[in-house]
Amino acid sequence: MTTAQILETARHTPVWHVWVCAAGVSTAAGQGASGPHGDRDDRRAALLSRLEATLGGRREPVRSTGVGGTPVLEAPGLGIVQRCPTCGRDGHGAPRLTAPGVRAQTLPPISFAHVGGSRPGTVLAWLDVHAEDWAVGVDVEDVRARRVRRAFTPGPDGAADIDAVAFSAAERAGLERGAAAGQDPVTARARLWCAKEALVKAAGTGFLADPSAVDVAASDVRLVPLGPDVLPDGWVGALALRPLTPPGRS
């Protein structure tokens, strides 16, 4: 798996990018982002600045031919708006890009994830497609973080404190089988949790009920596990790609 992974679909092939801004992370040009590491707003701003520079050098493809037409960004000023699809209020919900003189639907879908604790960082995921075509969600966890280990470490009965609320009976059974096969139980739970978070981020809703009700096998969503080739050592994550256009529409 690479930082820009082509995912084959029946309609088109969205290419995803995951950029990380965190202390001690060194990524190749075009495959990551560097910048301030202490404050999540600063990290997010650094990632947006990198994305603005990337989009500023691209040209919007003409859909009928696929040949580049007008620039994706004709002027600087890339920003973010959030509106909750459930309550209709601003300030939360899935982030969407804005830019001067550009229809939001022509900009790429994005998603952010933040890691706190002693190794803080921010992750930006974005797609090489229009926002009207796909939604993306990303989530990451640091399995070395005390908070994560406290939540996901099984007790003497084999269950972690969060299991009953976070995972369905079938998922808990799968975790037990994985532990019996030698999988690290904290990492396995963190990966599954990230998949659920990524799904609800791609939906733009957050958790509307217990996380155990979120089915990671949803048929219209593609889940991509994120590992050490993309993330800092000790982090795990997941990317969710949700198509927004009906089959047959280009």
Spans of features found by a protein language model:
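Core catalytic alpha/beta fold that binds nucleotide/phospho-ligands
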Residues: 1-250
